[in-house]
From Swiss-Prot:
Protein's name according to its UniProt entry: N-acetyl-gamma-glutamyl-phosphate reductase
GO molecular function (one): NAD binding
Similarity comment text for this entry: Belongs to the NAGSA dehydrogenase family. Type 2 subfamily.
Keyword line: Amino-acid biosynthesis, Arginine biosynthesis, Cytoplasm, NADP, Oxidoreductase
Organism for this UniProt entry: Deinococcus geothermalis (strain DSM 11300 / CIP 105573 / AG-3a)
PANTHER family, alphabetized: N-ACETYL-GAMMA-GLUTAMYL-PHOSPHATE REDUCTASE, CHLOROPLASTIC-RELATED, N-ACETYL-GAMMA-GLUTAMYL-PHOSPHATE REDUCTASE, CHLOROPLASTIC-RELATED-RELATED
């Protein structure tokens, strides 16, 4: 049997490079590559987009939309790693663990949108709790994200590593202070919320690794931190890549969180922290923004689309690889 053909449009970018690295050596897939000299040639791209069984788009939003328009072969399926289609009608949301229906929706879909990194951390915490009725969908929420500099793309990586300049380069920067960020609609739609949360992202001087935090006033909700933890643990029970960390005596075992702990993996850890008087809770997710937040999730989604998820691939990559 001929292995499925995969074309990564944008394989020279941060996410594209890591997707390709995670797929290298896979004998059950065939990777199609564009001649580097023709990387910006629309006809060369069109040819490969239509020759692939799955086209993976690692492009800016406008270019991703153009790439979708180039695909005329009805048999070509699309996995879009941009934010162009994450709330678009007709596109499956590529988070297999998010709901009981998610895997089948991804498996059956022709068009799949890979989640954003910050949004992955947020909706992983929110969706099980809104579905369980523990968080009302109209609850005003604040979300904070802390990412390594690779979350800013190739230009920011090069600036941090001495190959260019970028206004976001430095040990720690807050941004999107207009209070508008492209992940907010995704957080609302797939987190089960009626309104976008107030979201403030921050980028630090480490290469990769991310924390996403959501504070809650439990006294206003009429729920306990233990109930929140139980709902998350029940929802993700048995999942290979999403772990709800133990909750004993009102706290996880780890009082200090390093955003880099899961680097190189496709794993996602969820924590519930509780204040001593039971009035407050802090929901936290930890992931590699280039792993479960981007390329690891993309390779997992490829396998779900192709019915290969049960093959046991780890989707791991060495840190910084």
């Amino acid at each position: 049997m001929t292995p499925p053909r995969i074309f990564i449009d944008g394989e020279a970018g941060t996410t594209g490079l890591q997707i390709r690295a995670r797929l290298e050596g896979r004998e059950d897939l065939e990777l199609l590559s564009i001649d580097p000299a023709r990387r910006k040639d629309p006809e060369a791209r069109r040819e490969l987009l239509n020759a692939a069984d799955i086209a993976v788009l690692c492009l800016h939003d406008d270019v991703a939309r153009e790439a979708v328009a180039m695909i005329e072969n009805p048999a070509t399926r699309v996995l879009d790693a941009s934010s162009a289609h994450r709330t678009a009608q007709g596109w499956a949301y590529g988070f297999p663990e998010l709901t009981k229906q998610s895997r089948e929706e991804i498996r059956a879909a022709r068009l799949v949108s890979n989640p954003g990194c910050y949004a992955t951390g947020a909706v992983a915490l929110l969706r099980p709790l809104t579905d369980a009725g523990l968080l009302p969908p109209d609850l005003p929420l604040s979300v904070q994200g802390f990412s390594g500099y690779s979350g800013g793309g190739r230009a920011l990586v090069e600036a941090h590593e001495g190959r260019g300049e970028h206004p976001m380069a430095g040990p720690f920067k807050s941004y999107a202070l207009s209070l508008i960020h492209k992940h907010q609609p995704e957080m609302a739609r797939h987190g089960g919320l009626k309104h976008a949360p107030l979201f403030t992202p921050h980028v630090g001087g480490w290469r990769q690794g991310m924390l996403v935090q959501i504070p809650l006033h439990l006294g206003l909700l009429g729920v306990t931190a233990a109930q929140l933890h139980e709902a998350l643990a029940d929802h993700y029970a048995g999942e290979r890549f999403v772990r709800v960390m133990p909750f004993e005596h009102g706290q996880p075992a780890d009082p200090i969180l390093d955003p880099q702990t899961l680097n190189g993996t496709n794993e996602l850890e969820l924590f519930v922290y509780a204040g001593p008087n039971g009035e407050h809770a802090l929901l936290v997710s930890r992931l590699d923004n280039l792993g479960k937040g981007a390329s690891g999730a993309a390779v997992q989604n490829l396998d779900v689309m192709l019915g290969l998820e049960g093959a046991g691939h780890s989707y791991r990559l060495a840190e910084g690889g």
